Amino acid sequence: MATWVITGANRGLGLEFAKQLLAEGHTIIAGVRNPEAMDFHHEQMIVYQLDVASTTSVETFAKNVKSSVSSIDVLVNNAGRMDGRWQSLEEVDPELSLDVLNVNTIGPLRVSQALWPLLQGDK
């Protein structure tokens, strides 16, 4: 079976991906912001702290993953953030927009770059 890394695996789609893949026998490495708040546990799932908005957190996550497995078959960059409200132009907070952009756009780039050597395997 394959080794999958899923970011944002503590709830929603990320958690459901993890559950479905675990049921098929895959190994999951879950990146979550708050591992202590994780309600779901499974013997084939390794959970590490990960804040995709933080380069330091991503580097630590990558080191933890590298200490657990020699390669990754699939990376699912699922972690994301949204404000959750519709706003007029006058109401949009530029700082919040930068944070959302950082998490949703730069975050997956950080994670992909940090885990790239493991995704390459023996290639």
Predicted stretch roles:
Residues N10, G14-K19:
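N-terminal Rossmann NAD(P)H-binding glycine-rich loop of SDR-like oxidoreductase domains
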Residues E24-D39:
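Conserved glycine-rich Rossmann-like NAD(P)H-binding loop of the short-chain dehydrogenase/reductase
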Residues Q49-T60:
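The beta1-alpha1 cofactor-binding region of Rossmann-like NAD(H)/NADP(H)-dependent oxidoreductases
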Residues S71-I72, L119-K123:
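Active-site loop of short-chain dehydrogenase/reductase
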Residues N78-R85:
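Conserved NAD(P)H cofactor-binding loop of Rossmann-fold oxidoreductase domains
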Residues W86-L89, D93-L98:
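Substrate-binding pocket helix/loop in short-chain dehydrogenase/reductase
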Residues V111-L115, L119:
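Hydrophobic positions on the long internal alpha-helix
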